[in-house]
Amino acid sequence: MSQAVKKYYDDHATQEWERLDNIRCKIEFASTLHLIEKYFPKQGRICDIGGGPGRYTIELARRGYQATLLDISEEEIKLAGSRLDELGLQAEFIVGDACHLNQFALGLFDAALLMGPMYHVIDSQDRHRILIQLKGILKPNGIAIIAYLNSWGLIRTGIVDFPHWYKEKSKLSSLLYELTFEGQALSDFTECYWSTPEAALQEIQKAGFKVISYAGAEGFAGGLRPLLEKLSTEDPEAYTNVVQFAAETCELKQYRDSTDHLHFVVQSPV
């Protein structure tokens, strides 16, 4: 993974911790926890790959899992360690690159989260290598949740978040396809790759995983940030119900292909 990605997360460790508390991202967080509870084994050893400041590591530790957090950012790992200490929880912390999962023993983990690296690795061969190594460190029939950024969802979100793009028709139409942004191509983010549902499925299946299901993390509420912010202020109970129901229905096919984040639930071969 590039130094640009590492620097971004070193510089934005606290922001990344807070991100999952914002009005829109609470749905992403709830959907991921829904998938963990639905598909992960009830106990075992879990690797949170690219898990940043440890929001999911905390939830895994709370549920009694033996959790390992791997992240490229030393600042994120420091923050995760302090947060778990405050809560009296334990986990293993490793500063490392998702491109080098072969540092772990084969068949070590019962399940894994791969929630960020696949949209920060530009080269398709490098992404394939990550998936192959992920498959290797999982036990037979091990479960993983793999996240991608989705152009098909971002075309809707962009109406609010980056409307200046839409002054050029070519940029608008480009959001129907895979996109890469190297270096500082995105002024308020870092180097990243945006996939499509079709491309992500092909990439995962090429690596030999069985796709059990996939979800749109934002569900039916994808792209609706201003309305969600308004609802959370004017009717907090209704907003809470939206978060819960969007998470519970995140696998419905009529929504999942048009959300910012795609979460694939996969199984390693026997």
Label every PLM stretch briefly.
Residues 207-270:
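C-terminal lobe and adjacent flexible extensions of AdoMet/dcAdoMet transferase-like proteins
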